[in-house]
């Protein structure tokens, strides 16, 4: 997930494009610096938010329908 606010300074973190973090992580170091300057991310805490955020939504969605409940009598019930 793209961060909404910086955890340290509480600055609003806008995703400049629809690709978000993957776009920034795949850049070369020089290009990353230009990106941060262009969108005015000068503090290290804000840069850290972009470089360390993990996108795990897609992984969670694949398990959404796999939920099940183990009943007291040992049977398994699926919610849907």
From Swiss-Prot:
GO biological process, one term: DNA-templated transcription
Single GO term (MF): DNA binding
Family matches, as InterPro entries: RNA_pol_su_RPB10, RPABC5/Rpb10
Pfam families in the record: RNA_pol_N
Protein name according to UniProt: Uncharacterized protein 107L
Native source organism of the sequence: Invertebrate iridescent virus 6 (IIV-6)
């Amino acid at each position: 997930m793209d961060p909404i606010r910086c955890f340290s300074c509480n600055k609003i973190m806008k995703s400049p494009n629809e690709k978000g973090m993957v776009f920034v992580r795949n850049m070369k170091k020089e290009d990353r610096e230009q990106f941060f300057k262009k969108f005015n991310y000068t503090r290290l805490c804000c840069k850290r938010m972009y470089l360390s955020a993990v996108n795990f939504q897609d992984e969670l969605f694949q398990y959404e329908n796999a939920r099940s409940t183990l009943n007291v009598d040992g049977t398994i019930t699926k919610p849907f």
